């Protein structure tokens, strides 16, 4: 098949030569894939509006020797609200970078595509902080990395303590005895663990209704970030900027 269709969300874009763009997209049909949009950087290009980051577009592609090329592009959903708000733009950049880091090319997953689409939609229309935490948690789950939050990850004992030890290497919480043998553990309140359980149970669309105190939000963000960075073996480029933006937002009552 020389020509085929993709229904895809653009994760990122970079310029190639004067007018071409290399896109990394995540599609329903093929998962993550790199494609080229010839001439898309030209002001009068018909492809221009459909190849921007975060856009959900329909692409017709023809096969190339090294990389497949877009022959036609139609924008299906641009999430325009994201582009005119720094908080939303940063949140969208974070989840697309996160997904790009976790998934390999050529592994389609309908649930993961739906998660990404829903997250972008919710970021475009409302406050995004719990949406980000929910996206992180559910992405870990789809990647087979959902932590054990009920029993000790080493011995299997039920955890009842109000302060909980979490070991990223073990992928879950630890009892007091097993925690003494781990060099790198994180301490969290029982409330943070219960909120994390809720992130896995509830649909992403419901999480904006979840009321969480600022201390629990801080702990939850730290827990998920530590776990994510351990498995990715790197810090994401967007997290440093997101942290600075979060601190500046505290003074005006908003956060991401």
From Swiss-Prot:
Q: Which GO terms describe its cellular component?
A: bacterial nucleoid
| Keyword line | DNA damage, DNA recombination, DNA repair
- Enumerate the SUPFAM superfamilies for this protein: ArfGap/RecO-like zinc finger, Nucleic acid-binding proteins
Q: Name one Pfam family in it.
A: RecO_C
Q: Does the keyword GTP-binding apply?
A: no
Q: What does this protein do?
A: Involved in DNA repair and RecF pathway recombination.
Q: What is this protein called?
A: DNA repair protein RecO
**Organism name:** Desulforamulus reducens (strain ATCC BAA-1160 / DSM 100696 / MI-1)
């Amino acid at each position: 098949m020389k020509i085929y269709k993709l229904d895809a969300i653009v994760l990122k874009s970079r310029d190639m030569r004067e007018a071409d763009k290399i896109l990394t997209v995540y599609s329903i049909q093929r998962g993550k894939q790199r494609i080229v949009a010839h001439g898309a950087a030209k002001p009068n290009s018909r492809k221009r509006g459909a190849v921007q980051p975060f856009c959900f577009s329909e692409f017709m592609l023809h096969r190339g020797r090294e990389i497949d090329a877009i022959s036609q592009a139609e924008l299906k959903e641009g999430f325009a609200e994201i582009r005119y708000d720094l908080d939303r733009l940063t949140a969208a950049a974070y989840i697309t970078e996160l997904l790009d880091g976790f998934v390999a090319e050529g592994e389609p997953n309908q649930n993961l595509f739906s998660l990404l689409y829903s997250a972008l939609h919710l970021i475009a229309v409302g406050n995004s902080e719990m949406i980000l935490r929910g996206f992180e948690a559910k992405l870990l789950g789809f990647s087979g990395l959902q932590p054990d939050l009920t029993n000790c990850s080493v011995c299997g004992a039920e955890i009842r303590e109000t302060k909980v030890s979490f070991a990223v290497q073990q992928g879950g919480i630890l009892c007091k005895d097993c925690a003494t043998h781990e060099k790198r553990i994180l301490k969290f309140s029982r409330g943070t663990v219960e909120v994390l359980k809720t992130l896995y149970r509830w649909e992403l669309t419901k999480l904006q209704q979840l009321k969480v105190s600022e201390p629990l939000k801080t702990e939850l963000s730290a827990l998920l970030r530590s776990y994510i960075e351990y498995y990715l073996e790197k810090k994401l480029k967007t997290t440093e900027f997101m942290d600075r933006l979060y601190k500046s937002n505290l003074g005006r009552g908003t956060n991401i």
